[in-house]
Regions:
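Conserved HGGG/HGGXW glycine-rich cap/lid loop of the alpha/beta-hydrolase fold
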Residues: 8-66
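Conserved acidic catalytic loop of the alpha/beta-hydrolase fold
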Residues: 74-91
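Flexible "cap/lid" loop of the alpha/beta hydrolase fold
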Residues: 101-104, 108, 113-143
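Conserved alpha/beta-hydrolase catalytic His-Asp/Glu region
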Residues: 127-130, 146-198
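Short beta-strand/loop motif that positions the catalytic acidic residue
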Residues: 202, 208-210, 214
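Conserved alpha/beta-hydrolase "acid-adjacent" motif
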Residues: 215-221
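Catalytic histidine neighborhood in serine/cysteine hydrolases
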Residues: 222-242
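Catalytic histidine-centered segment of alpha/beta-hydrolase-like enzymes
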Residues: 239-251
């Protein structure tokens, strides 16, 4: 089972969980979610069990006490501080969506922490028509059910959403005012995010994974990163933004890439 713990630094506290017993560090930086992914720690451990033998897997939440304004680069800085406090260096990073934005800044500002990284369904600069703005509006209005519906319809394929719609909507009943306030701060943190002009500072091996049906950020954003870095790109044709949850061999593709770049 995953162990949920808290790391305390001079500036903040951050919760995380870990599992696996390998000598290499694998750090997962999740994207936006209505409630903390830590509540699904055991499910995540099962989904990523293929890493557990060769890696110690760490998944970091955002800091516990959010400042009123919290740009993505500051999220990455706080994560770097947490990693340092836990003795994590030269890690294999997977960042999904907003977590992928954080991963870019982590590799730019703290190259010693990153051995290799995979960027999933993310962007180096957030497009003007991003669906995130609609989510911010719904969170501001306190519309938990509307936000849950919009979020799920945008990130999942129609077939996946139809299959799990009742379960997804039932989750809205557990979303608190505090959850909405936290979501709003984190979502607003993507506004003005732009790492594009600094991507050439990334020196580690990178794999970019995108989805042709991504309605949140778009597949073009994945291609833009890969073109700028000159790195490997793979686009899943039949999946949307949450391809990292839906595609059955997604984790295996990450694992193979990390194996290829291991010295």
């Amino acid at each position: 089972m995953a162990q949920i713990e808290t790391v305390k630094t001079e500036h903040m506290e951050m919760r995380y969980f870990r599992f696996g017993s390998g000598s290499r560090h694998f750090v997962i930086l999740p994207g936006l979610s209505l409630t903390s992914v830590l509540g699904s720690a055991d499910a995540v451990a099962v989904a990523y069990e293929c890493f557990a033998k060769d890696y110690t897997v760490w998944l970091f939440d955002r800091r516990t006490d959010l400042p009123p304004v919290y740009p993505v680069r500051e999220m990455a800085q706080d994560t770097a501080e947490a990693m340092g406090a836990l003795g994590i260096r030269d890690a294999y990073i997977f960042g999904a969506s907003q977590g992928g934005m954080m991963a870019q800044f982590l590799a730019i500002d703290h190259p010693e922490l990153v051995h290799a990284m995979v960027l999933g369904s993310t962007a180096a600069r957030v497009p003007e028509l991003s669906g995130i703005r609609e989510w911010i509006r719904l969170a501001e209005e306190g519309d938990a059910k509307g936000l849950t519906l919009s979020f799920s319809e945008m990130v999942y394929t129609p077939a996946f959403f139809a299959q799990y719609k009742d379960l997804i909507l039932a989750m809205a009943d557990g979303v608190t005012k505090e959850d909405l306030a936290r979501f709003m701060v984190l979502a607003k943190g993507t506004e003005g995010m732009n790492a594009y002009d600094e991507l050439d500072r990334i020196q580690c091996p990178v794999l970019v994974l995108g989805a042709a049906q991504d309605r949140v950020l778009g597949a073009a954003q994945s291609k833009e990163i890969a073109d700028r870095l000159g790195c490997e790109l793979y686009i899943y044709e039949d999946y949307g933004h949450a391809v990292y949850d839906e595609a059955p061999e997604y984790k295996d593709r990450i694992l193979r890439f990390f194996g290829e770049v291991t010295a």
